[in-house]
Amino acid sequence: MAALWKLPIAFICENNLYGMGTANARAAANTNYFARGDTIPGFKIDAQNVLIVRETMKWAKQFCLKEGPLFIEYSTYRYHGHSMSDPGVTYRSRDEIKHVRDFRDPIMLCKHMLIENSWATEKELKEIEKQIRSDIEKDVAKLLNDPEPTFEDMYSHVTLTRPYIRGVTHDLTQHDYQTS
């Protein structure tokens, strides 16, 4: 429908290379997920690089507004398993994980680009990190001292405006039409 109606939408598939307990190549005959959009054009990007992601999405927005839907596969990496029962090291080596952390980590790559292009100095980045850590510590301390929320708080600041649907009452469980 998106292709038929040329909807301005980008479908994003985050490919972290592993399903639960197995590599993609062992679970799919075609791991080029971007090609599965049928008539929707698609491509793959290196989502470990934040600048590539930013520039791709700026371009994708303009493309979708003019041309219609687009399918983008984000090639990224999952450092950890899915759960306690999936330690994430039975189907890949610790060396592989370490290699990605050391050479392909998005935060590390971004820092390197900022410094290499003279957009920031190492000192400036350390100050930013220090400020972020301080802000987080303050927020955590505040939250730990806040009272526990009550059951009634669960509904605070929650609003629902139900759309009018002909033949349906507001509780969405009973029809308001008459039978004869």
Predicted regions and their residues:
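Glycine-rich ThDP/TPP pyrophosphate-binding loop and its adjacent helix/strand module
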Residues: 1-145
